[in-house]
Regions:
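N-terminal compositionally biased, intrinsically disordered segments and leader/signal-like regions
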Residues: 5, 15, 72-75
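N-terminal secretory signal peptides that target proteins for export/translocation
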Residues: 1-9
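Short, surface-exposed secondary-structure junctions/capping segments
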Residues: 61, 85-91, 104-110, 129-139
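Acidic, serine/threonine-rich low-complexity disordered tracts
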Residues: 27-102, 144-233
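Surface-exposed beta-loop interaction hotspot
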Residues: 110-148
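Bacterial N-terminal signal peptides
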Residues: 13-23
Length: 233
């Protein structure tokens, strides 16, 4: 993906991105609570305007201790320009960034040096797709594809392709009341789609990520993550 690559090819997408930009001019902090069996994770997302797009910090605090920290630099359409990942418990320290015609991944993994290079051309790189798919949720396209670098399982240290399929509008219970949400299903692309998919719901008014339901790992319990707090700084 080149830095000039836009989320969509048609004119309305530019309007959607500009609308999202105006909504996110102020710094925001979002908190999500995720439950997977007996495991609870609190995800805190801090979003700050940082031309040409945004700077995002994500801290994931797992019950029993241990924090995974990530940072993201994005374009205005929320596609990824740079990403860092730190998980001391798994001895993972990663840095990936868009450099010309390549995405360069470097760092350490369980004491071993990591150096990888992925072609940037093709579908967009969206590492934090919970946030990065807001523009698609608000558009009218039926399907969309993107890439993301894996940090666990068979896709670890690889860049995989994902397909997003629009499921339509749904009434869901959120915050004690019924609201209209936009339902997206994300899966691995092609034949790999049989191995994983997750369901994501976004607020109709502004494309805010509200809820996730799916399995985070093969054989694991179904995980449910939901927005619990929004704060404008």
């Amino acid at each position: 993906m080149k830095m000039t690559n836009l989320y969509f090819r048609r004119g309305p997408a530019t309007v959607i991105c500009l609308c999202l930009f105006s909504l996110l001019l102020a710094a925001e902090t979002l908190t999500y609570r995720e439950v997977e069996g007996e495991i609870t994770v609190i995800h805190t997302v801090a979003i700050m305007p940082a031309p040409p797009g945004y700077s995002i910090e994500l801290a994931s605090l797992r019950s029993g201790g241990g924090v995974v920290r990530q940072t993201f630099r994005t374009a205005v359409d929320l596609s990824t320009l740079a990403w860092t990942f730190s998980d001391p418990g798994r001895q993972m320290e990663l840095d990936a960034r868009l450099q010309g015609e390549a995405i360069i991944l470097s760092g350490t993994l369980r004491g071993k040096k990591v150096e990888k290079r992925f072609a940037a051309a093709g579908v967009p790189w969206i590492q934090l797709f919970q946030m990065g798919l807001g523009p698609f949720a608000l558009a009218n396209d039926k399907k969309f594809q993107f890439r993301s670098i894996g940090t666990q399982g068979p896709g670890e240290m690889k860049i995989g392709k994902f397909t997003v399929t629009r499921q339509g509008e749904e009434e869901i219970m959120f915050g004690g009341k019924e609201i209209i949400a936009l339902h997206l299903r994300i899966s691995l692309s092609g034949l790999l789609s049989i191995f994983w998919h997750g369901d994501y719901w976004y607020r109709k008014g502004d494309g805010r990520f509200l809820r996730y339901r799916g399995k985070n790992r093969p054989g694991g319990s179904v995980a449910i993550s939901e927005l619990s707090e929004e704060k404008v700084d």
